Amino acid sequence: MAAEIICVGTELLLGEILNSNSQYLAQELARLGIPHYFQTVVGDNPERIKRAIAIARERAQILIFTGGLGPTPDDLTTETIADFFRTPLQENIAVIADIEAKFAQTGRPMAANNRKQALLPLGAELLANATGTAPGMIWHPQPDLLILTFPGVPSEMRQMWQGVAVPYLQSQGWGKTTIYSRVLRFQGIGESALAEKVTDFFTLTNPTVAPYAGKGEVRLRISCPASSEALAKEIIDPIAEEIKAIAGLDYFGQDEDTIASVVGALLRERGETVAVAESCTGGGLGALLTDQPGSSDYFWGGVIAYYNQVKIKLLGVDPEIIEYCGAVSEATAEAMALGVKERLGTDWGIAITGIAGPGGGTEEKPIGTVYVGLADPHGQASHILLQFGDRRGREWIRYLSACQALDHLRRRLQSS
């Protein structure tokens, strides 16, 4: 038995709203061990909704709808489902009373069109909404088919899912197995290069291993169906350790780890501090660091040295370095890193200088050329050269530069 998620709303098709409901429900279905192979997004059109139901009915036995439960004329989910299964609607008195009470709490009378939200197909059970006015339903229109409907508001949907739908599904025998996944995260290696290193793992059937690209990183998802999360972890653990050993320093964390959170944890463990000097990233590196709770333990501050005179006056970069090597150069990056480390009194200094575009590139230093300087606790400076090209644009170059700068520091911390 499989489930299919059907999200209703023209605003979703137009890209006006991020469809976070489908992501959440997919994760929840995996947690409950309910197979889920398809998702559908359909606009507020009765005939197209019916076609979506007909298609989903052929390949799933649990249909989960979100959206289209409001009081306006374009909220059509409930009546369209009822019409598809040729079932009349009936007004639920308890829903009317609940909606009236919620309006009374705000000092307003219930609008006439809200009565529409109390209509449910004959035989359907109420899926109560504790916070909003749009209830859902639990309905078996056919013996081998379960329909669950939820409002499109994510907070309401999640509360109804956890509070009502999950207990119901568990009472029907679901949730006895789980599909647990662990995501391994890698930095400084491309998806194809990583795939070559771990290709033998892709043929496994339990657990399964699959690569996918994240923003500025590569990820491997290891998934395992099992009777419990603890058992799934036991199965996954040795596979994950093998992959991490093969990847070496290209592996930086798992699941919710970010490159900034890992760097922060390493600095905190060592009792060390860092400061940053940024040119083309304009504060992006500092932002990644300060996104982490408690980052004041190890991050002392930074200088945005966009103008060359700021590099000279605030960071102490020798004017001759800029004149003869250029503002975008290994020498300037190293001098900036040393300067910010010395002036802020930290153990480490990181600096970024580069050409993010869309202008400023030359044949010698094209757009996407970025130098990262690193000053260590011994006062020694080093650098790496990043060459992104200009295909993905300015913001992508800036973001990747900040991530790669942190990764450069991570590798030094983990190897020293």
From Swiss-Prot:
UniProt record similarity statement: Belongs to the CinA family.
Family matches, as SMART domains: MoCF_biosynth (SM00852)
Originating species: Synechocystis sp. (strain ATCC 27184 / PCC 6803 / Kazusa)
Name the record gives this protein: CinA-like protein
Organism phylogeny: Bacteria, Bacillati, Cyanobacteriota, Cyanophyceae, Synechococcales
Disulfide-bonded cysteines: none
Pfam name, any one: MoCF_biosynth
